[in-house]
Amino acid sequence: MAAELHVELVAADRSVWSGEATLVVARTTSGDIGVMPGHQPLLGVLESGPVTIRTSEGGTVIAAVHGGFISFADDKLSLLAEIAELADEIDVERAERALELAKSDADAAAQRRADVRLRAVAVR
């Protein structure tokens, strides 16, 4: 049996995934980190990004994570996220609509900033 680590991926509102793995890759404020059995203990802050889990059975689990913490000690890895979704659970069309809405909001904000600048110039 290969060396394993126990992984718990938990969102603020639910347990997302739990099981045995041989490798977990996550994005932290210090950069991407890969954790394997026997890794030195660590505590870090998660950035928004993908988490990739190589399961003990040879499969791969991918999740989208937004903020939170990563903790590892004694071959137990905890990913405590503000928001986390397994890739299989994500509705692509809904995610694309949300992205377009965010882009349009950013454009509206840029237009507001430009309007304020123009009004400031008019007052001079």
From Swiss-Prot:
Q: What is its main location?
A: membrane
Q: Does the keyword Protein biosynthesis apply?
A: no
A GO CC term attached to the entry: proton-transporting ATP synthase complex
Kindly give the membrane topology term recorded for this protein.
Peripheral membrane protein
Mention one GO molecular function.
Answer: ATP binding
- Protein origin, superkingdom: Bacteria
Q: Which UniProt keywords apply?
A: ATP synthesis, Cell membrane, CF(1), Hydrogen ion transport, Ion transport, Membrane, Transport
Q: Where is the chain membrane-spanning?
A: none
Q: Which InterPro entries match?
A: ATP_synth_F1_dsu/esu (IPR001469), ATP_synth_F1_dsu/esu_N (IPR020546), ATPsynth_dsu/esu_N (IPR036771)
Q: Where in the cell is the protein located? A: Cell membrane
| Pfam families assigned | ATP-synt_DE_N
The UniProt entry's sequence similarity note says: Belongs to the ATPase epsilon chain family.
Q: How does it assemble?
A: F-type ATPases have 2 components, CF(1) - the catalytic core - and CF(0) - the membrane proton channel. CF(1) has five subunits: alpha(3), beta(3), gamma(1), delta(1), epsilon(1). CF(0) has three main subunits: a, b and c.
Q: What does this protein do?
A: Produces ATP from ADP in the presence of a proton gradient across the membrane.
| The name this protein goes by in its record | ATP synthase epsilon chain
Q: What is the lineage of its organism?
A: Bacteria, Bacillati, Actinomycetota, Actinomycetes, Kitasatosporales
As recorded in Swiss-Prot or TrEMBL, the protein's gene is named: atpC
